[in-house]
Amino acid sequence: MTGRAMDPLPAAAVGAAAEAEADEEADPPASDLPTPQAIEPQAIVQQVPAPSRMQMPQGNPLLLSHTLQELLARDTVQVELIPEKKGLFLKHVEYEVSSQRFKSSVYRRYNDFVVFQEMLLHKFPYRMVPALPPKRMLGADREFIEARRRALKRFVNLVARHPLFSEDVVLKLFLSFSGSDVQNKLKESAQCVGDEFLNCKLATRAKDFLPADIQAQFAISRELIRNIYNSFHKLRDRAERIASRAIDNAADLLIFGKELSAIGSDTTPLPSWAALNSSTWGSLKQALKGLSVEFALLADKAAQQGKQEENDVVEKLNLFLDLLQSYKDLCERHEKGVLHKHQRALHKYSLMKRQMMSATAQNREPESVEQLESRIVEQENAIQTMELRNYFSLYCLHQETQLIHVYLPLTSHILRAFVNSQIQGHKEMSKVWNDLRPKLSCLFAGPHSTLTPPCSPPEDGLCPH
């Protein structure tokens, strides 16, 4: 391949976790990934295929047959904060990770997620492995801890629903192993296994299944997905602001009601010159004090709408953005990894051939020429393997591009959740406002235009005159 291919808890629990995060000094994630033994290109075909394979229709194995509903139904994983601080000297943040599919509930630390992701990248370097959120930041607060929990939940759900990852032993270990040494178990599962290229029976024939215009197709797909990412990033930002405004509106309504109650509860005596209006002022204070209940209810409804849109709209947008970002990261790995290595190997081979021609022309010693010939043969084998990996990387990229398109209907789910939230929120708020109107009418319904306290019927919201 030449040229450009593709672009790349409750509040108490959160608060306790924020304190723990400030002192967290977890063990550094081990980077000693197991290194598979080198295998000649001719022997690759004889590798025993891994038991887990992408679901493929009869015919071209490059094409996938999945629906969004099938992917979403594979598993739903919950990630919740555990506020307890463990360790004699070091304090950590722990998460309870629960899987519907495996009917399991295990405790995991952030570094367990790191090793889990490392094993996925080790075994599946040509697939969309989602990124992890940052480990920590100085003075980590409740918002950071909660944002990281949400990001870890999105990460593990994307992995659990991936057609290939979902059938791998690494995922099962992470979601169901209840021992204390889960990191070692994850590493052991990858020892001497090698990556997907060494285990896939189609790896050496990947080129045969790729379309002739693969470069043009991927250039178009890359541009499309880049545009989709940029648009969804803006949608997410707007959705965040809409949800945030609903929560801010709730806070303002609550304060508004409290101030009305404060006015109604004021006991400061009236001056003598205002004694004639004392009854009017007293009635008005009673009325204002009674209205605070409705404003508290309005605040509650607005807060519910904001939280619902955070969970059902913003989080779904973040999930899709995480998926798109993993695709961009995959493209970058392809260009900076296998493609770059292939090009360097070709350049090195070209230099060797020149040296060989020069040695032959200068009649160098036979031993020197034989050594150079041996190195050239080794380089040819390396180039052959890299070329096979390059085509297999393109093969996987093509399938991952298909998965992105399978997830595109998630847009309709997000829009439906947003519209339903707006309808429900406005409907509930409208009902409370309408219930409030009769009470305002009561303020002006007294005899001789004297203000009377608002009536607060418990059920029907009607105010008898």
Swiss-Prot record:
BP GO annotations: early endosome to Golgi transport; intracellular protein transport
Residue list for modification Phosphoserine: 456
Skewed-composition ranges (Low complexity): 1-19
Consequence of substituting residue 147 to G: In a colorectal cancer sample; somatic mutation
Modified residues (Phosphothreonine): 452
SMART domains xrefs: PX
InterPro entries from the UniProt entry: AH/BAR_dom_sf, PX_dom, PX_dom_sf, SNX8/Mvp1, SNX8/Mvp1_PX, Snx8_BAR_dom
Family assignment from sequence similarity: Belongs to the sorting nexin family.
Name of the protein: Sorting nexin-8
Name of the gene this protein is made from: SNX8
